[in-house]
Structures are given as structure tokens and as C-alpha cells.
Amino acid sequence: MSRLTRILPLLLATSAFVIPAANAESPKMKMTTPVPPGIATPDKLETRLGTLSSFDGVPDKATAQKVYDNLDFQRGVQAYLNSIQIASMYGMRKGILEFGPANTTALLFETLMDSKALWLTPNTTSVYMTSWLELKDEPMVIETPPNVLGIIDDHYFKYVADFGNAGPDKGKGGKFLILPPGYKGDVPDGYHVARTKTYGNWVIWRGFQEDGDPKPAVDRTKKLFRMYPLSQKDNPPKMNFINVSGKFNNTIHRMDYGIFEEINEVVQAEPTDAEDAELLGLLASIGIEKGKPFKPDARMKKILTEAADVGAATVRTLAARPREDKYYFYPGEGVWTTPFPGGSHEFLEGGARVLDARSFFHFYATGITPAMTAKLVGKGSQYAVAYVDSTGEAFDGGKTYKVTLPKDVPAKDFWSFTLYDNQTRAMLQTDQQFPGLDNNKKGLKQNADGSFDVYFGPEAPKGHEANWIQTVPGKGWNMLLRLYGPLAPWFDKSWRPGDPELVK
């Protein structure tokens, strides 16, 4: 009797080694050795996919089909979550170009942005202006106005440059030269130079009201803002400035199967080296590949349709109910969250990409710049999001809620609340043109102890009309608290806003 034969009962009894079913029925050969645990896969596996059957490591046909359906579904969901920023930029480009061609069209919200504009979580106080930059073989010049916060992001939603107050022009305005992908030509002096990896690029800038008036910022843009090819610097084409305040303007991507078609449009338009090879590989695995038509068959379209549904529910969960403490300003003690928990505009933490943070941010907001990571006392802005009340229940537009801001709100410039539609993440559309308020609002009541009570509901509470923002019965909503010029008590958390409370 061989040594293996003598010890086999002991091995089986102690489960020290796994002998696949097929091998157990096979004759013991001269070269047979024990198989260390964890290497062999049992011929029958009970999983969330059901029973997976194999013959000594080779799945049967039914199992193979089941596994491939699952693999395609998994990759569809991950492609959705990891590419939502690409679809978002597709939506932005489409929304801008509906008003006119790239490079010569600028959209201006001359009397501010209201809820007719479907943009991701804008505010109601900045003077928004935007254009789409399309490069070809030569550099493009952008002449920028002073005193703005401006960003250029590429077609894959990656940072290209800042201009204005956070840019190299230091808020004075200037000439920027944007070099196209692969450009190796001369670069003239006299420009702030930036290189982009994509042909399509989003240009967005925010001006500031002066004594409550947006007109000075608008006038400076009309006078100074230009985009043109470098070869036309001596005779640049005229810009077409379009006032889109009060007009319907959709820049938001789809959340259903159509999101994959939107992502495909960007992949087809841009160089392959403009995006991470791993992500492009993930997209290729579901049929989105540069130079090839995206035409999933009936089976694959059904799988991707379900993947989009699960992806949509997943990213909405990431935004509304984050599960990690780092998304909460007061973990375990309050509902206020941040859509940007890290210190990197590339969503890096400890050398790793924080995937949920990237998905959450690009689902909820827009605009990428290193400046967003700055936490400067008395400068910039800070944002706190609430999707649920103090008990963890989603906001119901048919009910009334209250948020109390304790005295000495730590905002050097001003503070504001804005309400957003859970579905679109754009401003909530009500009878109020601007679904928000700030501390500069006329008639805003302050309590005797210096605190403020702000109300949210379908009807104004009697005596608190100036402190009220309207909601819509039958609809949910979420809110953003913004602090402009945030002060030290915000950062050290010695001051904190009250949680939204249901008013009974």
C-alpha cells in the first residue's frame, strides 16, 4: 500500500487538501501528489448565480453562458460607474452646441441661472458663462476677462488649466494658448500655455455680481473674451454671445442604456492615449471601442440595459446614502456630507483611486480643478449636502423641514441654501425662479440669539415667508449649504449647522 493511499482517509477527514470529484474517481498514477487547498475548484458551486457546474475544472456549456452573462453585466455596471464623467461631458458639449458652433459661441447667464437650466448643482448667485473649444491641428488662443473663476477641462473630464483668480493670470485676465493633442510645432511667447490630450474641451467661467448686479461681469466678458486659432490672431473671428438666462438648456447626461451611447460618442471622437488604458479596456469589453461601431446584439443590449439600471441605482445610493465616514462632516452625529472627500482633483488617496468618490462627484457636480482641493480660511467656498433629514428619511416635498444655523455663521462673504431635484440634480423647479436663499435676502429674519431658521416646504410657514424655500408635493429634493469665504470655525468644526428637522 502506497503512503498516499494510507494517509488519504486522514487528508479527506481533515480537509487539508481538496481532491476534485473527477480526480477522486481516477486511478492513482505514479506521479500523483496531494493538491494544496484553494487550488482546485469543486465541480458544483452554489452561488448567487445559481449552481455552477464543471467537469474537473471545465465549466459545462450552461455554466459558461451563465458566467459570461454575469461577466458582461458586471463590466457594464463598472463601465457605467467609472465612465459617468465621460457621459457628463458629452451632455455639456451637446447642451452648449445646441445654441451655436464651437469656438465662436459663448453662453452667458446675464441675469443669473435659474431652474429652467438643467445643469448639475449650479448656484443662483454666480454669473455663469461657458463655451466649447474644438481643436484641430493648430493651437487655439483664449482671451479671458479679469476677476473670474475659470476652468478648462478636456472631453474626458480631466483638468487642463485654470484661468482667472486661481489661474496664472492671477485674476487680471490674459491670453492662453491651448496646444492640441500631439502638437510639436512652435510655441510663441506672450501666452499662458496649456496642453490638452483631447480635441474637444469645456471652457467655463464664473463672474461675480457687484452690489447685486451681474451686468459688469457680463460686460467685461463681452468686451474681452475671445477664442480663435493662433493663425487668425491678427484678425480673430467675432464671438457670438447668447443670453440663456430663463431659457431651457439641458447639459445633463442620460441615466439609462443611452449613457453607453453617449460614452461611445466621446471615445470615437478622441485619441486613445487621452484616457486610461484600463478604462478603455473595460469599455471595449462591452463593445465601446474606438474605430468600431457600438452595436450590441439583443442579448448584450438587454444586459447593458439592466447594467444601466443597477448603475443608476448604485450611484444614486453613493450620493444619497454614503457608507464611509469620510463622506460625512460629522460622522455618526449628522447627515451633512461632501461630494468631494479627498485632497486630490484626480480622486487619489494613498496612491489609489477612490472610485466611489469619483462616481459620486461626477453624478452630482461638475468642473474639475486642483483649486477645488484648497481649504483656505476666508477664501473660496465650502459645500455641505443633505439628502435626508435627521432621522435618515428622504426629503418629501409635501412636508416642511427646518435647518437652524447657529449664530456667527462662519462665512466671511455670505452663505446660501439651494435646492436640487433628486432626479436631475439641477435646481428644483417650483413657482420660485431661484430655489434658494442667502443671507443677503431682504427681509431675512434672524433669531434673538443670532441664529437663523430656514424652512423648506410646499407652503411658507406663517411669519417666516422670507426664510422659506418652496418644495413640490410628491417630489423629493436635496439641498446644498454653501459658505463663501469660509472661516476657521467651519474647518475646526467648532461651528456646525443643525440637521434638517421635520416640522410636525
Give each language-model segment a name.
Residues 4-5, 14, 92:
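Absolute N-terminal positional cue centered near the fourth residue
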Residues 9-18:
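Bacterial N-terminal signal peptides
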